[in-house]
């Protein structure tokens, strides 16, 4: 569930990190949240965007929602003309100053540990950063320098 705020919201989902973000977005749409929202969804290949049609539908139906899929390992078979590279770097290219935003990050430990400090360095307030890292069985939760922890 989103905090009660007027700040624009940036979601960064790495691969299956889309699942918890999907839940938050569906709740926001149901409650009629009108704040600007962007979803940066990073995957390796085009076929990994497993519910792309749903996210595209949201972008058509909700003028305050914007979708930015990002492929990190695009191949010729992907026939991809969209954004490429690391998902958090794509977001930072579009939003170089994160002050006045809320950011929700969901994905692998490695992605969260790379993204959160980069976002804080770009002006994101500690109390406006929320993350949920997917830990392999037997692994440990990440310890980024800042952020609120679990979404």
Annotate the PLM regions.
Residues 16-21, 111:
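Hydrophobic/small residue at the entry helix of a nucleotide-binding pocket
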Residues 1-11, 23-30, 45, 71-73, ...:
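FAD-binding FR-type
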Residues 10-13, 105:
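Catalytic cysteine-centered active loop of the rhodanese-like fold, especially the PTP/DSP P-loop
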Residues 19-26, 53-56:
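Internal, well-ordered alpha-helical scaffold/interface segments
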Residues 36-151:
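Reductase modules of NAD(P)H-dependent flavoproteins
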């Amino acid at each position: 569930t989103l905090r009660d705020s007027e700040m624009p919201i940036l979601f960064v989902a790495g691969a299956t990190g889309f699942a918890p973000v999907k839940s938050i977005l569906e709740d926001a749409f149901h409650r009629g949240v009108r704040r600007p929202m962007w979803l940066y969804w990073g995957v390796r290949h085009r076929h990994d965007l497993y519910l792309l049609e749903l996210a595209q539908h949201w972008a058509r139906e909700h003028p305050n929602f914007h979708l930015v899929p990002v492929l990190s390992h695009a191949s010729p078979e992907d026939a991809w003309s969209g954004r490429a590279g690391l998902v958090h770097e794509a977001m930072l290219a579009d939003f170089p100053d994160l002050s006045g935003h809320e950011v929700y990050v969901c994905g692998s430990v490695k992605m969260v540990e790379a993204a959160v400090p980069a976002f804080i360095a770009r002006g994101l307030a500690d109390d406006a950063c929320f993350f949920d890292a997917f830990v392999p069985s037997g692994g440990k939760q990440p310890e980024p320098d800042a952020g609120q922890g679990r979404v």
